[in-house]
Amino acid sequence: MKSSVEQQSATRVKLTVEVPFDELQPEIDQAYRSLAQQVTLPGFRKGKVPPRVLEARLGRGAILDQAINNMLPSRYSQAVEEHDLKVLTQPTIDITRLEDNELVEFTAEADVRPEIDLPDFSTIEVEVDPLVADDAAVDAELDNLRARFGTLKAVERPVQKDDFVSIDLSATVGGEPVDEATTEGLSHQVGNGELIEGLDDALEGMKVDESKTFKSNLVAGDHEGEEAEVTVTVKSLKERELPEADDDFAQLASEFDTIGELRESLAKQVEENKKAEQASSIRDKVLEKALEKTDFELPEAVVEEQVKGQLNQLLQQFNGDEKAFDQLLAAQGSSREQFDRDTRSSAEEAVRTQLFLDTLADELQPEVSQQEFTEHIMFTAQRYGMEPQQFMQAIQASDQIGALYADVRRGKALAESICTVSVKDTDGNEIDPKEYFGEEENTDETSTGSADAEASENSEATPSGTETEESAEFDQAAEAPVATPTDDDSENAEK
């Protein structure tokens, strides 16, 4: 077999592969055996039809078609390995030449990982917030716990910040109604700023069944950037009632008997959470600076697949109802156009991050132990709210084992690189990154955390439609449309 590669762009290649017929004989024999099982001829048992009789019945073209499709996966993979290509997508394959009993030539075009020049991490300096785990932080954590056990009750008073309201919204521009900014029975917590500008200010002080009109600039839709008159009507008003922080609450909300014991436990949790936040901040800022120092082209097809994957994942929550999805976006002061722009930006960032980390992992070659891989599976299962065994079955069914292995490998490579970075907090205190990312201290959460999770959360382990080198398998090559010459074509094949 001979192969050559043509670089069509920084992210796409074209392989040309020639396979002599003497190397194709095992696939031809396999084709005869396979087709013999599918053909019933008088006088022959099934599967026992001689090759010459089978060829006379089906034609030489059918035999070659089967043999070539049997051959494609292994020869393509061999060519990819020979040229050390980091293939990201399934190839487009064409049979370009067939000389019966002489050779078969095919081309395969695919997106590949571009060449990436890695920065010197030891030159990177980052600054993060100091580690603060005081009584105020413990109080805030206790309040969060109380809120989980809180109840909503209707109140008869003006709306206040943090209240929960059900509202109707409508808007007009130039006296004409704006359909995409009209909704009824929308639930909203006052003060969270998630809906249109000026709404929270308008709501404060209103009463149930009261309406108010205010002006706001629309940020999306056909009237994006135009000033609209928005009318809001409060349909219901509730406040969250928190339980008292006493021993009874401690017994209700935890395994502790007293509020003092609960606070002590929360203090430890707060400290661990603050450390995790600081580690996450270090990781994210280091990765951001490393990417700023690196410029490379992104494979467009991979980005597009990532965009589609993100959109389909969101639409599943609306049972595929794009109209309902668009209405929600409008109620949030956004639009499909803005969503598409944001999604593409997110997809590009996810693909850029993964390609960079894959290159870093190839450079550093970190070893992933079985224990580390198991811990990552358990950590990821927890993120998705699944039992480890259930999650393992799901990723096996979706062929994502390789993708999860690649996650761990990227995380370890990044952690190793972060250990060489200069880190200080905003008070000027030096922080040794090895405390978080050293081999002994390194945990699954700190090594793979949000830097790699940013990509995986957007793509469910890998960018949609993308295959890393660790997980790629040429399992669809035989299904690729192949223009194999017919029986007549093979007789007149190019000499």
Swiss-Prot record:
List the catalysed reactions.
[protein]-peptidylproline (omega=180) = [protein]-peptidylproline (omega=0)
Query: What Enzyme Commission number does this protein have?
Result: 5.2.1.8
Q: Region labeled Disordered — which residues?
A: 425-495
Q: Where is the composition biased (Low complexity)?
A: 450-461
Could you tell me which residue ranges the PPIase FKBP-type domain spans?
162-243
The kind of enzyme this is, by top-level EC class, is isomerase
Task: Give residue spans, biased composition: Basic and acidic residues.
Answer: 425-437
Domain note for this entry? Consists of 3 domains; the N-terminus binds the ribosome, the middle domain has PPIase activity, while the C-terminus has intrinsic chaperone activity on its own.
UniProt-recorded name of the protein: Trigger factor
Give the species this sequence originates from: Corynebacterium kroppenstedtii (strain DSM 44385 / JCM 11950 / CIP 105744 / CCUG 35717)
Write the gene name.
tig
